[in-house]
């Protein structure tokens, strides 16, 4: 069995943070770092870092620490960044446009191919050369193009309908910004970003400290 399939979701959710911090270290020409030093920067314990990384192999050397470039490369591979991904955004409102304007996606290998919306005032416009198409063409577009991930940025009432179209056209990854928990088959991966949930978590923590 693939070892990665047995990795806990908690470890998986920490990997992007490792990747981001290692990228910053590379930009600052840091060649190596110990788990203790990484702990001070990233906020996890040194023991936790070693345990997490040991899930995927032996990356460090006692007395030397981690080679930053090599570790960043290995975590990139674990995260699947050794392959490019074609993406579409459904919903060209504020959130959709913000995502389309986020230039780091392309640096990570995520290629936003096009956007879809129902608003006649938006259809035909381009955001950073990304064209906004009529959502009525979503199914036919998916039939003709190789798309890996669909990003849903539509209102609550339309999100499940959009998800159904994505699933029907064999999209296996959905990044969902709509405030609804989608119903999809088990072989489709959904990552929810409910903005209000994050804000409510913040207010809870604020009140907890008072």
Swiss-Prot record:
Source organism superkingdom: Bacteria
Higher taxonomy: Bacteria, Bacillati, Bacillota, Clostridia, Eubacteriales
GO BP terms, alphabetized: negative regulation of DNA-templated transcription; response to redox state
DNA-binding as UniProt keyword: yes
Short name of any one Pfam family annotated for the protein: Put_DNA-bind_N
Keywords: Cytoplasm, DNA-binding, NAD, Repressor, Transcription, Transcription regulation
Major localization class: cytoplasm
MF (Gene Ontology): DNA binding; DNA-binding transcription factor activity
GO cellular component: cytoplasm
UniProt similarity note: Belongs to the transcriptional regulatory Rex family.
Protein name stated in the entry: Redox-sensing transcriptional repressor Rex
Oligomer and partners: Homodimer.
Binding site for NAD(+): 91-96
